Design a protein with these regions (language model features):
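Hydrophobic alpha-helical core bundles mediating ligand binding, dimerization, or RNAP-core interactions
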Residues: 82, 87, 112, 116-119, ...
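Aromatic/histidine-rich interaction motifs
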Residues: 97-126
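N-terminal helical cap/lid subdomain that shapes the substrate entry/recognition surface
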Residues: 70, 83, 96-98
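A short hydrophobic beta-strand segment most commonly corresponding to one strand
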Residues: 63, 77-94
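A short acidic, helix-capping loop that chelates divalent metal ions and anchors anionic groups
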Residues: 93-97, 165-166
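Short, Lys/Arg-enriched, Trp-marked, Pro/Gly-tolerant hinge/linker segments that flank
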Residues: 104, 126-192
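ATP/adenylate-binding site constellation spanning eukaryotic-like Ser/Thr protein kinases
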Residues: 42, 77, 117, 175-178
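Generic protein-terminus/edge-of-domain signal
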Residues: 1-61, 67-68, 75-76, 112, ...
């Protein structure tokens, strides 16, 4: 399927943060410079993805692609805990993450935990959940490299799962409908709608 020597390569992590949001708190609309991974650890958030909104629940991940308009709002009754990573990546496998959201499995959650641990070593904690943090002045040996490795591992696992799911599942009947909850989203979630 992928003819590239490197079908997926993480080229940098601009910033990353894990923070708890107050209900109703939201980010201003802006355009992604690179890719943006959003993972909801607890609670719920509503993500703006260009012209439509996606409700993410605990255990779900979403990717905003470069040049996509995005914003996030904390919704529900439980203050959500959200992990966000702004990164750059290339390779043909990254196409599978365009308009993608899905629930994580155990292997992917394990990678995400390792990534979150190294993010805490590399980036300063944020006071305001809407802000992305600055890098720490002193980073433990290999911290930047390990976070890149863990992110790449997570992306490879997700790309493989999406590839398997597409081969095994019939297309979502609502996928063709422009106003459907599935829209152009990952067929992985169609069964949950």
């Amino acid at each position: 399927m992928y003819g590239d020597e490197w079908p997926l390569r993480v080229t940098g992590i601009a910033s990353a943060a894990e923070s708890e949001w107050r209900i109703g708190q939201q980010t201003p609309e802006r355009t992604c410079e690179g890719w943006l991974l959003v993972y909801v650890k607890s609670g719920m958030v509503e993500e703006l993805c260009d012209t439509h909104r996606v409700l993410l629940r605990a255990g779900q991940i979403l990717f905003h692609q470069p040049a996509e308009l995005f914003a996030m709002r904390a919704v529900g009754e439980v203050p959500p805990e959200v992990f966000r990573v702004e990164f750059t990546a290339d390779g043909s496998a990254m196409d599978s993450f365009r308009s993608c959201h899905m629930r994580l499995g155990n292997a992917e959650k394990s990678c995400l935990r390792q990534l979150a641990e190294t993010v805490r070593e590399v980036f300063q904690p944020v006071q305001d959940a809407c802000q992305m943090p600055a890098r720490r002045a002193e980073i433990p040996f290999g911290g930047k490299e390990l976070q890149t490795i863990y992110l790449a591992q997570l992306l490879y696992l997700l790309a493989r799962r999406r590839q398997r799911t597409r081969k095994q599942s019939p297309p979502c009947p609502r996928r063709a409908g422009a106003g459907s909850p599935c829209g152009k989203r990952a067929p992985v979630l169609c069964a949950e709608h």
